[in-house]
Amino acid sequence: MARGFYFDEFTTGDVFQHPLTRTVTEMDNMLFSNMTLNPQPLHIDADYCARETEWGQPLMNSLFTLGLMIGISVEDISYRTTIANLGMKLVKA
């Protein structure tokens, strides 16, 4: 039996609190950057970030964050109900 929702079951303004959590590590960022062939120093070079950025440390790749949030949402929103990903609008970093 499906645990998620079909598109026509969603209502504008629905809010979901997802029970899954995960600590994101520096190694996650390094692995994701390497897997996606992204050499951006902003994500992988601690020395560069300490000298040249206002944050002083590497930033997590925003596409990793988006993918993680989608993954965390699957079990209670779309598990076994997704037919296709129809796209995303208004995604902001």
Whereabouts are the PLM-identified features?
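Hot-dog-fold acyl-thioester-processing enzymes
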Residues: 2-87
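Beta-rich strand-turn-strand
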Residues: 92-93
